[in-house]
Amino acid sequence: MAAANDYIVRDIGLADYGRKEISIAETEMPGLMATRAEYGASQPLKGAKIAGSLHMTIQTAVLIETLKHLGADIRWVSCNIYSTQDHAAAAIAAAGIPVFAVKGETLTEYWDYTSKLFDWHDGGMPNMILDDGGDATMFVHLGLRAENGDTAFLDKPESEEEEVFFALLKKKLAEKPKGWFAGLADSIKGVSEETTTGVHRLYNLAKEGKLLFPAINVNDSVTKSKFDNLYGCKESLVDGIRRGTDVMMAGKVAMVAGFGDVGKGSAASLRNAGCRVLVSEIDPICALQAAMEGYEVVTMEEAAPRADIFVTATGNKDIITIEHMRAMKDRAIVCNIGHFDNEIQVAGLKNLKWQNIKPQVDEIEFADGHRIILLSEGRLVNLGNATGHPSFVMSASFTNQTLAQIELWTNPGKYERQVYTLPKTLDEKVAALHLEKIGVKLSKLRPDQAAYIGVSQNGPFKPEHYRY
């Protein structure tokens, strides 16, 4: 149980409002509700102490309460300074679950809250991490690295965020007894990671032989990446831009940087709103896909003076540079739907004239007098300026997260310090849990048909190498 007032939220009085929306979301999240029904009695997460770092939304509240229903003890923070829905955080706090999340956190607050994940109210430590973007995971890894004597990197931050993060690590190293980070790393039995950026971090750590505990890559489950990343962005991107700007989308020229799953959903979102969509890509396969879908594939240099709306969706840095923004039309809209804010060179804009229009909407004026409108300071536009993906598509992602937590917790000897994905049988199970809600009726293979194509009548129906 949580200690009294073991939370930081904007207004606990919003809890009733949050609870009403959580109730509605539960109806739209059949995968999570089915998981509660299947595993509730057996309590597979009993004894698990989960440190969760994932956008504190209404949908995440349903995930948190599912984990609790399955026996877990939980502490939670948001993984983005703008993505918290304050009424969702209040409802979770009122339910007795420690949560530290406020929409519009400073970077100092963000990293302070993240550190609270690891200070359990009873003096203990978490033994599981549920992560989105990898910040909680990196807290453990970089903290242990510094504790072991390699501290030079703490004096060489490469961004404002790293400056704040490294200052926090120095503070923790001074406060905690020697060996605290080592004990924390030993305590963690595994991590499940939600998003592309965090997965890249995990694979890099594993490649270097530095991963401290087993990891499950939830992002690359088909029922996550091909649904959350694609269909979620298809609905939430334009929602964020409209709430931020009230701009007429139809007839505008929009530029999407990147044509992976997130880029595909983003381009479709803009096209469905009536935009003429340009796409940039480095990968010839993705570029060909974009062209075959009817998008004009150009470079950012070509698009900068042409487009009215710019969206980055690459997971890479410096995609929209200061020079690109100098070349844009007056009051071009610039935003990002990738996990981190470095896809746009926001740091290079700080010495220009800023005018805040409303929360998460800023107008920035260049020396020549032309302006851009920047949404969510280059952070996730769909969560900063709107409320993120709809509940139904998040149910699939979060059912994968729940199954990954169960797998890591109940089979601790099965996994080494590597990155794994969930088996296709579970992917198909997650999809199946969502069919009845939308009226889908599956066909059934006859025994002779199953034998003909070499699969079981009950699946899995595709080989592991199949690309959906």
Curated annotation (Swiss-Prot):
Which cofactors are required for activity?
Answer: NAD(+)
Q: What positions does the entry give for NAD(+) binding? A: 195-197, 229, 258-263, 281, 316, 337-339, 382
* Primary residence: cytoplasm
Q: Which SMART domains match?
A: AdoHcyase (SM00996), AdoHcyase_NAD (SM00997)
GO cellular component, alphabetical, reads: cytosol
Instruction: Report if keyword Cytoplasm is assigned.
Output: yes
Q: Which CDD domains match?
A: SAHH
Q: What does the UniProt cofactor note say?
A: Binds 1 NAD(+) per subunit.
- Identification of the protein by name: Adenosylhomocysteinase
Q: Which organism is it from?
A: Methylorubrum populi (strain ATCC BAA-705 / NCIMB 13946 / BJ001) (Methylobacterium populi)
